[in-house]
Amino acid sequence: PAMDINTTCTSFLSAVDIFSSLVDNGRYERVLILSGDTASAALNPRQPESYELFSDGAAACVLVHADKGENSAVLYGRQKTWSEGAHDTEIRGGCGLMTAFCMNEENREDYYFDMKGHRILKLCARKLPDFVDQCLEEAGMTREEIRLVVPHQASRALEMIMPRLGFAEGTYIDRVAQYGNLVSASVPFVLCKAIEEEKVKRGDMILLMGTAAGLTVNLLLMRY
């Protein structure tokens, strides 16, 4: 079968969380996950904070059951949405009462991506620390046991948010300056770069995490 899983910027994490369970229980033998977005098609040139941040990109991975003797695994996953952030990142047009046929010169900006960056940042600063603490407690994991954190490259505020979550510089990947926000391809793209650069090796504990429209937060713990 083929299907879409859409949690915007954390779609890859949602897909891995769902299908790793289905591979583990034997429902599927092999699953191909493709994550890609052409953000440039919906960016508003009058909104510099988003127009200059987002990039087009794609990434892919194949999920299979670990071979006998290997300990690679997805160990924990959790997702949560705080609906008070629903209108902080959105495209108002395109569906429901505002289909593409309704677009005209007067409402054109409703069909562009709209982001209220400062509001998102404040909401993340309030919600994320407790969320991460709860996840690590449920997973029975400490920050010291995690070899590398691969966060969604949401914005340049990454270097401000990560220390608030208890992760010092050098314990996480920050490539916003090089690649921008690659939307759903962000986490797998940066994870691939970390593997290519040998920042992680087999058996290392990795934390994948990200924020998305909603405001949705997604976290995965995996042993590479």
Question: Model features per residue range: what roles?
Answer:
Residues 5-27, 125, 129, 136, ...:
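Claisen-condensing/thiolase-fold acyl-transfer catalytic domains that form or cleave C-C bonds
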Residues 32-39, 100-106, 157-169:
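Acidic-glycine-rich active-site phosphate/pyrophosphate-binding loop
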